[in-house]
Amino acid sequence: MEIFGHVVSGLGEGKFFVGLTHYKNKFEELTGFTPFEGTLNVKLKHNFNLDEFNPIEFDGFEIDGKKYFGGKVLLIKLFNKQGNSINCAVVAPKKTDHSKKTLEIIAPIQLRKFLLLKNSDVVKLVI
């Protein structure tokens, strides 16, 4: 399945969360790659129901009394308008400030730099 969306600025929290050792190790286990510390945010025209695609679930954890929530991961391939692509994953935390129209994507590299992306660029996600 192909889905199109636009690159948008995030909330600035992806770098922190992906950088946490527990999340980083879990994402590596589930995706097969060590994620770059940050996410690419892609806004869709319609709500996205990750559960329709059999995502992989992961549990939350606790550090020094602070609870970090689990979520779901879905492996995808992301393409820029030039047709360059990379294997990556949509991450859907159980607790998020994003709408169901905004996807957070992790990859082994900085997607904006590797795929030469800027805000409003159209990207294609292949599931």
Swiss-Prot record:
<dbReference type="InterPro" id="IPR023602">
    <property type="entry name" value="Riboflavin_kinase_CTP-dep"/>
</dbReference>
<dbReference type="InterPro" id="IPR023470">
    <property type="entry name" value="Riboflavin_kinase_archaeal"/>
</dbReference>
<dbReference type="Pfam" id="PF01982">
    <property type="entry name" value="CTP-dep_RFKase"/>
</dbReference>
<feature type="binding site">
    <location>
        <position position="104"/>
    </location>
    <ligand>
        <name>FMN</name>
    </ligand>
</feature>
<feature type="binding site">
    <location>
        <begin position="109"/>
        <end position="112"/>
    </location>
    <ligand>
        <name>CDP</name>
    </ligand>
</feature>
<comment type="function">
    <text>Catalyzes the CTP-dependent phosphorylation of riboflavin (vitamin B2) to form flavin mononucleotide (FMN).</text>
</comment>
<comment type="pathway">
    <text>Cofactor biosynthesis; FMN biosynthesis; FMN from riboflavin (CTP route): step 1/1.</text>
</comment>
<keyword id="KW-0808">Transferase</keyword>
<keyword id="KW-0479">Metal-binding</keyword>
<dbReference type="InterPro" id="IPR023465">
    <property type="entry name" value="Riboflavin_kinase_dom_sf"/>
</dbReference>
<keyword id="KW-0418">Kinase</keyword>
<feature type="binding site">
    <location>
        <position position="41"/>
    </location>
    <ligand>
        <name>Mg(2+)</name>
    </ligand>
</feature>
<dbReference type="InterPro" id="IPR039063">
    <property type="entry name" value="RibK_CTP-dep"/>
</dbReference>
<dbReference type="GO" id="GO:0009231">
    <property type="term" value="P:riboflavin biosynthetic process"/>
</dbReference>
<dbReference type="GO" id="GO:0008531">
    <property type="term" value="F:riboflavin kinase activity"/>
</dbReference>
<dbReference type="GO" id="GO:0000287">
    <property type="term" value="F:magnesium ion binding"/>
</dbReference>
<feature type="binding site">
    <location>
        <begin position="10"/>
        <end position="15"/>
    </location>
    <ligand>
        <name>CDP</name>
    </ligand>
</feature>
<protein>
    <recommendedName>
        <fullName>Riboflavin kinase</fullName>
        <ecNumber>2.7.1.161</ecNumber>
    </recommendedName>
</protein>
<dbReference type="GO" id="GO:0000166">
    <property type="term" value="F:nucleotide binding"/>
</dbReference>
<keyword id="KW-0285">Flavoprotein</keyword>
<comment type="similarity">
    <text>Belongs to the archaeal riboflavin kinase family.</text>
</comment>
<keyword id="KW-0460">Magnesium</keyword>
<dbReference type="InterPro" id="IPR053397">
    <property type="entry name" value="Archaeal_Riboflavin_Kinase"/>
</dbReference>
<feature type="binding site">
    <location>
        <position position="39"/>
    </location>
    <ligand>
        <name>Mg(2+)</name>
    </ligand>
</feature>
<keyword id="KW-0547">Nucleotide-binding</keyword>
<dbReference type="GO" id="GO:0009398">
    <property type="term" value="P:FMN biosynthetic process"/>
</dbReference>
<feature type="binding site">
    <location>
        <position position="96"/>
    </location>
    <ligand>
        <name>FMN</name>
    </ligand>
</feature>
<keyword id="KW-0288">FMN</keyword>
